[in-house]
Design a protein with these regions (language model features):
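General small-molecule cofactor/ligand-binding pocket signal
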Residues: 123-125, 151, 277-280, 310
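Dinucleotide-binding Rossmann-like beta1-alpha1 core, especially the glycine-rich loop
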Residues: 1-33
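Short, surface-exposed acidic
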Residues: 50-59, 177-180, 270-277
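Active-site/ligand-binding neighborhood in enzyme catalytic cores
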Residues: 20-136
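Charged, often glycine-rich, active-site loop that binds/positions anionic groups
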Residues: 287-297
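Internal hydrophobic alpha-helix adjacent to the cofactor/substrate pocket in enzyme cavities
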Residues: 327-340
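Mid-domain catalytic core of redox enzymes
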Residues: 129-236, 240-250, 254, 258-271, ...
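Short FAD-binding loop at a beta-strand-to-alpha-helix junction that anchors the flavin cofactor
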Residues: 236-237, 302-320, 326-330
Length: 340
């Protein structure tokens, strides 16, 4: 469903179901106090407002696509944040979506940002893997890297995921360690596919069928000027959100490619093997911190018990969805609060 007409003609839902669903979405868009949704499971809240049939036909497939079985312990604040973002992308209610992009992608943004801060005298070092963080008697903080080099700092900001924090920061208090260790994550496997021709005219296709091995189809060329930026080719992303312990992280790239492409061709019979120019796979085990019940109350502070050490990562996004905009805003708020 991509517009109001398709929504009204959607066969699996009765007229009453559609009214309840529309009311549910509209009501969620008007809620300002998101914290009151943190103590309600998303399943319970959606069933209350949309009804069981709509939950089974609409909400459950979408929740499982995004969260897997972890939806069962996710709070209603998650769906509130999702609906808020959906409304923010529309100019006039449900009439028109407004999406934008930066020509050149995030590489252009990062290159520009890097040049600016380097001109300010900042040194950027990449491929430095931190193994150990420790504060010394002189209050300086040292970071030991995998390449056996050591950096000494007055202040240090870590942006790494929670499961790594407690491994490299032994001086944190037990309370801090427990809080970080109790954060639950979802990981992602994402295939980037370059095609000779488009799959469809839609930017995002949410998948609700259990037999499909990926959870959505994001076709960038439906949003971006493909003639100008992709040489009239089509760039498609196929993400799959899973637990960090999921067996797919041990599956070979060849097996994932075979499974994903076969499914894509089943969904789009016009797609031939010759149409597939490039197929690349990215993996990340700790991407999205699950907003479990009363999540914001259990979240560790950005300022740690170690003077000068701050931990600021995507787990601190408590009233929004995980995306670049929210991440940048989080960084700006943290910098203004502690270093402004």
């Amino acid at each position: 469903m991509s517009n109001s007409l398709e929504f009204l003609s959607f066969p699996p839902l009765s007229l009453l179901d559609k009214i309840r669903l529309g009311t549910n979405i509209f009501y969620a868009s008007k809620i300002k106090n998101w914290r009151k949704l943190e103590n309600i499971l998303v399943e319970d809240w959606l069933k209350k407002w949309s009804g069981n049939n709509t939950f089974q036909k609409i909400w459950l497939p979408l929740l499982k696509a995004k969260l897997g079985d972890a939806y069962q312990k996710t709070s209603a604040a998650f769906i509130w944040a999702t609906i808020q973002r959906m409304y923010a992308a529309r100019r006039t209610g449900l009439k028109k979506e407004m999406f934008g992009y930066v020509p050149g992608g995030y590489t252009r943004i990062l290159d520009s940002f890097s040049k600016k801060i380097e001109n300010m005298g900042v040194k950027i070092k990449t491929n430095y893997i931190a193994n150990h963080v420790e504060q010394h008697l002189n209050k300086k903080i040292s970071v030991k890297f995998q390449n056996e080099q050591t950096g000494i700092f007055d202040n240090l900001i870590l942006t790494i995921p929670a499961p790594i924090i407690t491994k490299i920061c032994p001086q944190l208090t037990e309370t801090e360690k427990n809080k970080w260790n109790n954060i639950q994550y979802l990981g992602v496997i994402c295939a980037s596919v370059l095609l000779k021709k488009p799959l469809s005219r839609y930017y995002v296709t949410n998948i609700t069928e259990d037999w499909v091995p990926f959870t959505g189809i994001i076709e960038m060329s439906a949003l971006v000027d493909k003639g100008k930026y992709f040489n009239n080719k089509s760039l498609v992303y196929l993400p799959k959100y899973v637990s960090p312990q999921d067996a797919i992280f041990k599956t070979s790239d060849d097996d994932i490619r075979h499974n994903f492409i076969n499914t894509l061709q089943r969904m789009h019979p016009h797609l031939n093997s010759d149409d597939i120019m490039t197929f690349k796979i990215s993996r990340a085990k700790h991407v999205f911190a699950l907003p479990t019940l009363n999540y914001s109350e259990k979240l560790p502070s950005m300022k740690t018990s170690i003077p000068g050490l701050f931990i600021i990562n995507a787990a601190h996004i408590v009233n929004g969805t995980l995306n670049v905009n929210e991440t940048i805003q989080l960084a700006e708020r943290a910098i203004n609060k502690y270093f402004g």
